[in-house]
């Protein structure tokens, strides 16, 4: 194992059975942000332990995970399907390894494309982890171009608002289907331009609202506070003039990406991804099918 990874997750890899009670947050990259907010609360009842994102866990990590779960009294988890990545990491499977008195709060996988109407995630069974170059997000304009489909997107205020409303409704429906204990879909509109940095990187106001609801669900004071930094800060998608105008946002538009703090021209992203689609045509077909409803809202 990489020494940097072991050091970063020292409490996880050093977990032993019979230690003090802890809180664990399990899920994707959003889970660590939630954990940071819970850990920053002076009233949160037990220490939190940083755990690798569920998609990074391997069979070699299971002994450390099980030792930690045996000490977990507060467990906050996103929905994870059974046998995820051929490992016993599904929510139902993990819950069986918790102490009988552990409190469990289920929270949603947060996706919001309302600020970034062309941004999309596309998976294909050939390799569900494969993402396009430069940024790990697809662009519906580049997808349709690669598919050979003529399209002049409708970015009228009405269309932009319809896409934003559809995004909120989509998340609310996923929350309902997953049977989560706390929701966040109702927080998106009021968060405005800070609702999301990318479609799966919610902004601080949404994460703080989520953390307070998780605290409340655990019976703790809902006092999560801004940590003084942007939590999911690695990538920021463009916030275009059409979106700023259509949603009435009180911010300046930005047509470029920000990746690792560095501006990246959107044209550079789209050019690299056009080349990528030439070598990965199955992702084009999958993306067009998966996002047909949103394409229709945008005039396709």
Language-model segments: residues:
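Extracellular glycan-modifying ectodomains
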Residues: 1-300
């Amino acid at each position: 194992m990489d020494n940097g990874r072991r050091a970063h997750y020292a409490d996880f890899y050093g977990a032993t059975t019979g230690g003090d009670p802890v809180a664990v947050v399990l899920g994707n990259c959003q889970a660590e942000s939630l954990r940071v907010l819970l850990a920053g609360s002076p009233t949160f009842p037990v220490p939190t332990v940083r755990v690798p994102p569920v998609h990074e866990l391997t069979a070699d990590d299971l002994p450390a995970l099980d030792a930690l779960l045996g000490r977990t009294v507060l467990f906050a988890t996103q929905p994870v399907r059974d046998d995820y990545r051929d490992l016993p990491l599904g929510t139902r499977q993990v819950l069986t390894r918790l102490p009988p008195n552990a409190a469990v709060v289920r929270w949603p996988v947060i996706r919001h494309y309302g600020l970034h109407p062309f941004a999309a995630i596309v998976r294909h069974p050939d390799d569900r982890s494969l993402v396009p170059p430069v940024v790990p997000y697809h662009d519906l304009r580049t997808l349709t171009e690669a598919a050979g489909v003529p399209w002049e997107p409708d970015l009228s205020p009405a269309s932009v608002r319809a896409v934003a409303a559809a995004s909120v409704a989509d998340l609310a429906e996923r929350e309902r289907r997953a049977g989560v204990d706390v929701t966040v879909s109702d927080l998106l509109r009021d968060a405005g331009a800070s609702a999301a940095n990318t479609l799966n990187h919610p902004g601080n106001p949404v994460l703080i609202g989520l953390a307070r609801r998780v605290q409340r669900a655990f019976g703790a004071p809902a006092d999560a506070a801004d940590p003084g930094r942007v939590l999911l800060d690695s990538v920021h998608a463009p916030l275009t003039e059409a979106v700023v105008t259509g949603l009435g946002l009180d911010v300046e538009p930005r047509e470029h990406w920000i990746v690792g703090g560095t501006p990246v021209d959107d044209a550079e992203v789209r050019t690299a991804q056009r080349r990528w689609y030439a070598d990965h045509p199955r992702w084009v077909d999958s993306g067009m099918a998966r996002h047909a409803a949103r394409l229709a809202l945008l005039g396709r």
